């Protein structure tokens, strides 16, 4: 997959040069292209924003630099143009899975008080992280892109790594433990030391169900319980 990122602050995405995504780039599994919107402005002072018509606080990103940067990206990337903004649908794991199946994507990061309305006709999709305010689109783009890339085959190394993670099927992940066995009076559950893989699997499933029911009822209502799930929950409630 190739992802083109349109931004005023390309240095913010240096985080992708490290860890899992860094290795995926080295192995040519994914390609990240950074395009600085400021490089495409026609203003001699490299200005990319201006005062809003009708008055109001702050500055608005002008259409010309953004649209020209989108056109430049599309010269070698025919993917959907995704804008990180408050009007969009709230991003979730299903959206990440759907987008991970695309061959290419283009992400547009806004800044200041927003973008000129005339840019929207060049945008295919708008997504939001939630009902709160961030300094810029870059801060929203990083987790969105990361969540998409880790679903691409070969990025994590083995499929089980993301199948078992939180939200992969509307469930929170089960509790994890490592050494030491005892820490400040708390012990690792004995079942995890039993070596009985089927019992461990059932225990983990029950923990995921129980945690989701208690902490994320909004997710739990979407869970389709299997016969085994109902049996496990029934035993716990006795």
Swiss-Prot record:
Gene3D superfamilies: 3.40.1280.10, tRNA(m1g37)methyltransferase, domain 2. InterPro entries: Alpha/beta_knot_MTases (IPR029028), tRNA_m1G_MeTrfase_C_sf (IPR023148), tRNA_m1G_MeTrfase_TrmD (IPR002649), tRNA_m1G_MTases_N (IPR029026), tRNA_MeTrfase_TRMD/TRM10 (IPR016009). GO terms for molecular function: tRNA (guanine(37)-N1)-methyltransferase activity. It catalyses: guanosine(37) in tRNA + S-adenosyl-L-methionine = N(1)-methylguanosine(37) in tRNA + S-adenosyl-L-homocysteine + H(+). GO terms for cellular component: cytosol. S-adenosyl-L-methionine binds at residues 110, 129-134. It is found in: Cytoplasm. Signal peptide: none annotated. GO terms for biological process: tRNA N1-guanine methylation. Homodimer. Specifically methylates guanosine-37 in various tRNAs. This is tRNA (guanine-N(1)-)-methyltransferase. It comes from Clostridium botulinum (strain Eklund 17B / Type B).
